[in-house]
Amino acid sequence: PGFADVTVVDLPDAVLRGDEPEPFDADTELRRVAVHAVGDKPLPHGVGATVRYAPGSPQARCLEDRQGVLEPVLAGRGPEPGGHSLITVPLRARGATLGVVAFHRCERPEPFEDDDLSLAQELAARAAICVDNARRFTREHTTALTLQRSLLPRGRPDQSAVEAAYRYLPAQAGVGGDWFDVIPLSGARVALVVGDVVGHGLHAAATMGRLRTAVHNFCALDLSPEDLLTHLDDLVARLDHGEGWAAENAPDSGIVGATCLFAVYDPVSRRCTLTRAGHPLPAVAGPDGTVEFVDLPSGPPLGLGGMPFETTELELAEGSSLVLYTDGLIEDRNRDIDAGLERLRRVLARPGRAPEEICEAVLDAMLPSRPSDDVALLVARTRVLGPDQVAEWDLPADPAVVSRARTAATGRLAAWGLDDLAFTTELVVSELVTNAIRHAAGPVRLRLLRDRALICEVSDGAATSPRLRRARNEDEGGRGLFLVARLTDRWGTRHTADGKIIWTEQRLPSR
């Protein structure tokens, strides 16, 4: 008020989006972002209005010449009603012109002088640095948000084990490193993952992308939950010590840290195996409305190294909802974790809702309009593969049983209406059962699952995995597994506490 009666700030939309401003010309449209007037003086253009400056006007000359313009006496030509003296100064920072600020005198009789122009230029220079910092933050925030959204799941994977819904909300302070995933596994199982990388911005989003990719790769190897977290822990430790991307692109980003919760659900046994690395406890909402927070060993956050991860196994009723989330859902500056968990329990206690409805109810009840920390939420309602979709046989370690196994398998395929897959399945059963009897010890089990694909599994007590190779012309064996791999859509090995399982998948014929 002691300097000007009216002050206005105009910026191009590109600056408001965080982009580099284009060169200014007569057609450049600006957005009025700030107005301050002494008293109740009416103004023709308020905040949010678009303005264009006439060629030759003080503002236009200011932007073209990138110099402050002093108009001591306007003689009624001022852009604001009643203005008689004007100073316009470009907002320049780091070599770029970001906009213009105009100071008007309407009520004060004294015109602006050269000393006033110097003061206005000093004020504008300081303000321009703040505007450019905000522009750069907006650009980084937008880039990080775009990167994170591109790294998060875009759709629901093709699996039958759970009905899933999820949400991600960025933080008010900036994009963080929260992520979630639903990953189909062999044997009709599914992996559910939620994680949280420490920090905000591009570094957190990029680190999240690396960890999410690593989890997918480890899942493809059919690692156990505790082994998967051990490998992920080692990866975070290497990032923390500045290997690869971290050393080249984020030398001053600080310590890399992350938490993670990893669960595997089997729709045949209804068993769910969970492990966590410093992550909040998951909740299980039963179909009857009961809610429990799973008592999981905490495990250290990822990156500390040297500590084993422990698992907990649950049997879930069909229709149970497994709720995984990051700490931003239950904790903020005004609420401790216990209060957040109790509120979450109350929200989940209402039965009969689909996962999408649960997500909406949880976010509405738990979060303000703009959370201080980013939030990832994953809700998975369990399904079950019924007895009519599963067939299994325990086989003695006798080569004579192979033909009986083939007959049993083709008979079950006929009952399922899958005769088109009988020939390939006979070959798969013959090869896998024969190898198990020949090379493994202990009992052999054959299992067929009719899910979105026909799954054939043969388990035995040996820990060694078969190796796919191309047999030489003089070799008497070694071709069976190669044929299995060529005739089926997918195959692999997963280890169990008692040995291993060799599995194959075939697409079901279209109806």
Model-identified regions with their sequence ranges:
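Active-site-proximal, acidic helix/loop segment immediately C-terminal to a metal-coordinating Asp/Glu
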Residues: 201-222, 298, 316, 320-366, ...
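Conserved beta-strand-loop-beta-strand hairpin that lines the nucleotide-binding pocket
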Residues: 437-511
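Acidic loop->beta-strand submotif enriched in PP2C/PPM serine/threonine phosphatases
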Residues: 173-177, 257-260, 292-334, 443-447
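Catalytic core of PPM/PP2C metal-dependent serine/threonine phosphatase domains
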Residues: 143-165, 205-300, 309, 313, ...
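GAF sensory/regulatory domain recognition
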Residues: 2-51
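A short, aliphatic-rich beta-strand micro-motif
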Residues: 84-92
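Primarily the active-site beta-strand->alpha-helix module of PP2C/PPM metal-dependent phosphatases
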Residues: 113, 175-246, 250-254, 323, ...
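Regulatory sensory and allosteric helical modules in signal-transduction proteins
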Residues: 31-80
